[in-house]
């Protein structure tokens, strides 16, 4: 069946325009807010306020959706899912190595909490990479 669509989402509508810098600034701001809201949610949990944590998590997810729209507007992803997954797979592999190096540095400096988290998140990046590779192997042969 042929689709006769007249209105769709488009990737990269602000790329190369005078709005590109504003969209990029908003993308970066929204990403930062996601991390801050999630950190605040963790603090709320530590303070025994789980319902506050859930509200903050919800706000973080809405901010992440905003970031996603800004990423689409500036063409930070392509219109080809396989290419996007391959791009992210490379990034996860790089993050795996960089976080492990940061863990080693933190250990040398005697900053155990930083070492522990960098080491753990390095393994998370490896897990993410394996998941993305699995998707590529199964769906994009």
Curated annotation (Swiss-Prot):
Fe cation binds at residues 63, 66, 125, 128. Coiled coil: none annotated. One of its GO terms (molecular function) is oxidoreductase activity. The keyword Secreted does not apply. Pfam families: Rubrerythrin (PF02915). The keyword Metal-binding applies. Keywords: Iron, Metal-binding. Residues 13-141 form the Ferritin-like diiron domain. PANTHER family: RUBRERYTHRIN (PTHR43339:SF1), RUBRERYTHRIN-RELATED (PTHR43339). This is Uncharacterized protein MJ0746. It comes from Methanocaldococcus jannaschii (strain ATCC 43067 / DSM 2661 / JAL-1 / JCM 10045 / NBRC 100440).
């Amino acid at each position: 069946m042929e689709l006769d669509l007249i209105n769709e989402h488009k990737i990269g509508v602000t790329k190369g325009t005078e709005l590109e810098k504003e969209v990029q600034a908003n993308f970066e701001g929204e990403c930062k807010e996601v991390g801050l809201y999630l950190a605040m949610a963790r603090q709320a949990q530590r303070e025994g306020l789980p319902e506050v944590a859930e509200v903050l998590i919800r706000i973080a997810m809405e901010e992440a959706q905003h970031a996603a729209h800004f990423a689409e507007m500036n063409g930070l992803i392509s219109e080809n899912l396989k290419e996007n997954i391959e791009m992210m797979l490379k990034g996860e592999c790089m993050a795996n190595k960089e976080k492990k190096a940061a863990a080693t540095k933190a250990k040398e400096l005697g900053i155990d909490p930083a070492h522990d988290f960098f080491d753990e998140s390095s393994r998370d990046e490896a897990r993410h990479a394996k998941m993305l590779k699995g998707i590529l192997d199964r769906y994009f042969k």
